[in-house]
Amino acid sequence: MDTSDKEYLKKEGYPLMKGAAQFCKAWLVSDKNDNLITSPATSPENQYKLENGFEGATLYGGTADLAMIRECFDKTIKASKVLNIDADFRAQLERDIARLHPYQIGKKGNLQEWYFDWDDKDTKHRHQSHLFGLFPGNHITPSKTPELALACKNTLEMKGDETTGLSKGWRINLWARLWDGNRAYKMFRELLRYVDPDGKKTEKPRRGGGTYPNLFDAHPPFQIDGNFGGTAAIVEMLVQSNENEIRLLPALPDAWDSGTIKGIYARGGFELELYWNNKRLDKLIISSKLGGKSTLIYGNQTKVIQLKKGEIQDILW
């Protein structure tokens, strides 16, 4: 859908998406409120702790499961519409997505990870799988779901920044999606913190993430997720197109007060060049590989563009 390659979507993408959606549908059951939940469920590698001291990992209605299912159903529905096929199955997904157990905000203002408002056994646990809807998912955003976005922010604040490379790479992207460029940049710098492979000259323990001299993300032995996550985060700090619009410099850190980026792609087949000075966007050069319409957002400014295939526009701000 992001490239408008309908042939690929029809032959490869949609069958895979539909199969995943069918699997998820078979996994769902109704709770006492007639909401759909997963059962059994876990939240990857994390555990909860009850007031009576009981610790567990298995439950039902885990937030991470439901976040991924929301994203899967939403994308499958959209793909079905693009291809104009499977209207009956699409209708089933539309009914089911409306019945999914809703997100819950806990007593501490955090996004609940569990079906109930339970505490984590480890309050600083490296995983934040229940924030999937914010990133890499697209259905939680500061503009469209501000209360949920704030709950995600509170969750990240509670967990802190010190974590493994995999998790640090993910959290940089989460902060970028929350439009907090300085926090994202802080963690990006920590991701690049030197780690001695022999553990003799390391500033902080390996569990805190960092980078080996060969630029591999430190864990040990190696977490490529940290490398990929850090790279993705640079893009997310400068351009976001996860809400159908193209948002320019949404999480620009103070440290990058002036700069240029070329060859960055946005959903819909748009290629961008951005030029900024003193933390202000000066110029955008945008071209369309497919032809189409989009909305550009920079701060409080909005511009609607319509480009033909191969057309290039220079836009001054």
Where are these regions (language model features)?
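The feature captures the catalytic groove of carbohydrate-active enzymes
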Residues: 1-11, 25-91
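Glycine- and aromatic-rich loop/turn segments at beta-sheet edges
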Residues: 29-42, 108-115, 164, 198-218, ...
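Secondary-structure transition/capping motifs at alpha-helix termini
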Residues: 1-11, 23-35, 143-144, 178-185, ...
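Long, low-complexity segments enriched in small/aliphatic residues
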Residues: 90-131
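Long, well-ordered core segments of solenoidal/helical folds
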Residues: 16-32, 97-108, 151-161, 188-200
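C-terminal substrate/ligand-recognition segments
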Residues: 1, 121-200, 220-236
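Carbohydrate-binding/catalytic loop surfaces
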Residues: 35-62, 111-123, 178-179, 217-225, ...
